[in-house]
Amino acid sequence: MITDTCILHIEEVLELLPHRFPFLLVDRVLNFEKGKFLRAVKNVSFNEPFFQGHFPGKPIFPGVLILEAMAQATGILAFKSMGKLAPGEFYYFAAIDEARFKRPVQPGDQMILNVEFIKERCGVARFKGIATVNEEMACEASMMCARRKEI
């Protein structure tokens, strides 16, 4: 179980991210430093709607949603690092590279999302993300998000 100080509760996460149930995949932020890193939690519950079909009798958290959870964590770090958006702007998930899956994530797991700010240029930020369960790597990827006008 995590014993770190909770820095951002769900109410604050909801203020930063546009996602809502069933697509909000960050439950709380444990720690962050602007322009450096963010550590967040996703508690994986059997009640998640996708477990009905992924996979019946052997529920596994979809890998694409692990990546989405890390992308949402990078979005929070981007908001905290690069500041508030101007009217009509939005942070878009722009790219993912070198994604690797190392272990399945299952109901009952607590997934820790660690994202690290690498660099920012012209409104495009690069991040490194690692998702772990019980300190064992489940997924890693390089990601980018872009600050752009809303489409």
From Swiss-Prot:
Main location: cytoplasm
Pfam families linked: FabA
CDD domains per the UniProt record, alphabetical: FabZ
Locations listed in the record: Cytoplasm
Enzyme class: lyase
Active site: 54
Keywords attached to this entry: Cytoplasm, Lipid A biosynthesis, Lipid biosynthesis, Lipid metabolism, Lyase
GO biological process: fatty acid biosynthetic process; lipid A biosynthetic process
Catalytic activity: a (3R)-hydroxyacyl-[ACP] = a (2E)-enoyl-[ACP] + H2O
Keyword Lyase: yes
GO molecular function: (3R)-hydroxyacyl-[acyl-carrier-protein] dehydratase activity
Keyword Lipid metabolism: yes
The EC number(s) this enzyme carries: 4.2.1.59
Single GO cellular component term: cytoplasm
Gene3D superfamilies: Hotdog Thioesterase
Superkingdom classification of source: Bacteria
Protein family per UniProt: Belongs to the thioester dehydratase family. FabZ subfamily.
Role noted for this protein: Involved in unsaturated fatty acids biosynthesis. Catalyzes the dehydration of short chain beta-hydroxyacyl-ACPs and long chain saturated and unsaturated beta-hydroxyacyl-ACPs.
Protein name in the entry: 3-hydroxyacyl-[acyl-carrier-protein] dehydratase FabZ
Organism (species): Blochmanniella floridana
Gene: fabZ
